[in-house]
């Protein structure tokens, strides 16, 4: 009895990661220009800013790490109370591919060294909250 040889190549499943978003909450008035100047762990060519949008992009291996100013979206009284209680002056949405997590952590550590702050989840109550060291 002869078996047919399976000529079909098996597809290797490639982990493409997931895009996730958190809020980087900063206790200082900073702009994307300040953010980009504080990041040294990536090549200069990998960093780009759009000052008119208050947006920074850092090209990483799987995708880009993007910081976008989100202060205008925190308009509810509860939001403002939260920000005031935590001493937050600026909020940036930070979105990235989970496959880039190690490099994202390095970038966040550099930003934290320069400006302080913490990460909050993109949820209704902003929980859980992470210190940069635990992120």
Task: Describe the residue ranges of each PLM region.
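Acidic, proline/glycine-rich low-complexity IDRs
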Residues: 1-22, 30-49, 95, 102-135
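Short, intrinsically disordered low-complexity segments
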Residues: 26-99
